[in-house]
Amino acid sequence: MEAARMGFRAKTLPHLGNGTRLPLKTKLSLFPMHLLQNHTTLSRRSTKLNLCVKACSKTSGVESSRPLPHSAPDLWGDHILSVPTENSEFDTLETEIESIKPKVRNMLMSSHKTDKERICLIHLLICLGTFHYFEKEIEEILEQAFRKLDMLFTDEDDLETTAIMFEVFRLYGHKISCDVFDRFKGVDAKFKEHLVSDVRGMLQLYEAAHLATPFETILDEALSFTRYHLESLAGQQATAPHISRHILNALYKPRFLKMEIIAAREYIHFYQKEGHDETLLKFAKLNFNFCQLHYVRELKTLTKWWKDIDLPYKLPYIRDRLLETFIGVMAVYLEPHYSLGRIIATKVSQVIVVMDDTCDAYGTFSEVRSLIDSLERWDPGAIDKLPSCLRIVIQSIVETMEDIEREMKPRGRSSSVQDTVEEIKIMGRAYAEISKWARAGHVPTFDDYIELGLDSSGIRCFAMYSFISMEDCEENQTNAWFKSKPKMLRALSVIFRLTNDIAGFEEEMRRGEVVNGVNCYVKQHNVTKELAVREIKKMIRDNYKIMMEEFLTIKSVSRPILVRCFNIVRLVNLYYEEGDNFTNPNGKLKDLITSLFFHPLPL
């Protein structure tokens, strides 16, 4: 990768708030003139419209037949650049956190605490989002406690404590049996009715039941039992308002499927209204605000980079979604020390969105084919032979990856960059084939579609470039596991692909885009859309269980890598819980971005 003109340097890291320029050859928009005149996002440079040229095709008929882009404009502009991130505030937060950490560590390691009490404290740290400061201590405690599992559960009849221990052990990769919940069943093999009065126990059992592996029937039963009764409990006057809100938040989305930083913010509000430990509460608030400052500084770096390469102006059909992309990357890495990882993953994600939109929503089949052929060659010298808009797309991908390789090579992690390039090519080939189907109006069988759809989902690629900067994980071991095509990554891809297809089905069909998992299932099985969605949702649930089974059994790669795979699932739920929130971010996603980047917690 010799052709990149500028790479990361130390001064571009987020704590200095300076952006990395990834220059392209022209500042002119190369989008067709008649579409430019109707595009709402171009008001900042209207004086340049007379310089625009047609993007790809030489045939005006092709240009006039292109559909106008349907995505909403960027919601945020440059607002993030005005958010204060003073060094003094940053230093104050860091100093306070460092002063409290030993106190929390002493609570955790105290010889006066039983194993159960330590595990319950670990659970509280997970809920408050502060667990990452004590990973070594937590792993040591759980390793020792797991050796005494029988003693831990002997005579334990408290539902909340049992469910907490089950959840914590599973989250840290210990394969605890779901049989620990048998004691809460009656002679009729159903959960005992008196459990319903234990609101906290019911809520904790509900959360724990989401960590099921295949064939764990008791956890399926627990989920149905708790969901049914919690819906009723949330509406009862006898239930305290803050507990009702906590129940409703969990029923809307369990903690396991929420971004960790979002779950932490919610739980901090809940914990504050409970009988709480002031030290732990303050520590959680300081951590949230400290993470928030980190994220905003990283976003300032990324915003300057995004403005420099100026792709939304040059290619106005693309979805301009920098903050929305970044919040998805945050789902993968909560911890402040993964700043470089968040920057790298956001940059790669942004240029892949550009490629996706070009193939999916703008290019003709011949243009898509040319784009992917050039991508396969990965030859900077051949870029100038491409039509103008394709040249910009390829250049943005190639130069971004070259920048990243330049940054990672001195760190000894360049092979992950090369593997990411290969994954981008695989994704590109899938885009081309799906584009061929779509332009021909061909609806493949669901079985044919799903294999190609997994590649086009980009989730394997996303996982690969999420690992690039994880210097605490051995690169060769991680890459070898990745190349073995593990069941965990396949299950993750299925979850993303099918969740995306359900969320986008109605809009895609309105646009005449018939190559969608739901539509393919309807065709192959000759069923209604409603039945197809129901069956596909069952496939999604089954693949969650496969992921958990793999998480508990894989020994060939370190736990942090497996955790990132689960965190990508949180991204899926963030983007596609109610429609396509990435394409249309007004609503819940907009509110989440506002709360995470613009509203610190009062101390």
UniProtKB/Swiss-Prot annotation:
One of its GO terms (cellular component) is cytoplasm. Binds 3 Mg(2+) or Mn(2+) ions per subunit. Its cofactor is Mg(2+); Mn(2+). One of its GO terms (biological process) is terpenoid biosynthetic process. CDD domains: Terpene_cyclase_plant_C1 (cd00684). It holds the Pfam family Terpene_synth. It comes from the Eukaryota. It is found in: Cytoplasm. Predominantly expressed in siliques but also in flowers. Its EC number is 4.2.3.-. Pathway: Secondary metabolite biosynthesis; terpenoid biosynthesis. A motif (DDXXD motif) lies at residues 356-360. Mg(2+) 2 binds at residues 356, 360. The Asp-Asp-Xaa-Xaa-Asp/Glu (DDXXD/E) motif is important for the catalytic activity, presumably through binding to Mg(2+). PANTHER family: ALPHA-HUMULENE_(-)-(E)-BETA-CARYOPHYLLENE SYNTHASE, OS04G0344100 PROTEIN-RELATED. This is Terpenoid synthase 22. The lineage of its organism: Eukaryota, Viridiplantae, Streptophyta, Embryophyta, Tracheophyta.
